[in-house]
Amino acid sequence: LDNKEAKMFAFFSAILIILTGCTTGEEEPPAVVDGPERDLSEEAEQPNEDNEQQVREAVEEIEHIHDMAFDREEEGILYVGTHYGLMHADLNSGEFYWQGTEEDRHDFMGFLITAENIFMSSGHPGHGSELENPLGVMKSEDHGGTWETGALYSEVDFHLMDANEGDSEYLYGFDAYGGRMFKSQDGGEDWSEVSAEGINDRFHELYSIISDPEDSERVLAGMANGIYESLDGGENFNLFNNELTMTSVSQGPDGILFANGIGRIEGLMKSTDFGETWEVVGELPEEAAPVLAIAVDHNNTDTLAIGTASDSIYWSDDQGKTWQLIVENGEPA
């Protein structure tokens, strides 16, 4: 195997291991208790939209990092979709706790936060939930404290989701449950399947999707052999860049893309022209590979976070020049 093939093999292997453990959502969750070095008591109050009080449970361990995104209103607040719930990570204070009660701690696969700070996700019902599997498209308007099921309930399991930054009425999702790609033009209320010609026979090689804030019908897809482009809302894809691919991608303000690259560029890369050109940004720690998720803070684009196949999370406050390990092998550092 050449270097690119070896990297792709490692990434495929990591994805396979994670997906094998994320199919039913019926396993017992790990214990959640207060971390010994964090000022976070079991009696801490977490207000929700109805001003009810919930008990914050500090994170002792996470398993299977699937996706992550930063809060749109408050700087330095990272949310991480995992096998056993949505983790709230405050990079300012070092506090890590689970969002919501046990019945709302699902196996969050695809996860995003829209420009309006609406949380959306998909996946499998968690321990204690009576919901059907898969969950379809879920929404939360209280930072993931509570979730409501909606479109495609019990029909799809979106492992990849994207909300257009220019028009969040436009959303895209890849359903790993049925091997299909969908599009919504009304904020996720209604969805239609798109044909995805050009990549639909290789969905097992699809890593990432992102749409252009200046043209919501333009979509980039990171595939094993390069980046593909659709100009018609996901109906047809053509090879756009065969020199590199993006195994995970996040969009910052003004359409800036940050991605984990494999190929001509290895590691963190940035594009200011929506994928036309890419440049190296900083340097990822060697032990961070393979990277499964990446997020940029819209409140401060110097702040980045990555999640790895080893259930580790790193964050940077200087756009990738230096990194701090905050979760190591599933345990808050």
Which residue ranges define each predicted feature?
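Repeated scaffold domains used in trafficking and secretory/extracellular systems
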Residues: I65-A69, H106-L112, V156-A163, F203-I210, ...
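Short, solvent-exposed loop/turn segments at conserved positions within beta-propeller repeat blades
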Residues: G128-P134, F174-G178, R202, G222, ...
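Bacterial signal peptide processing site
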Residues: T23-G25
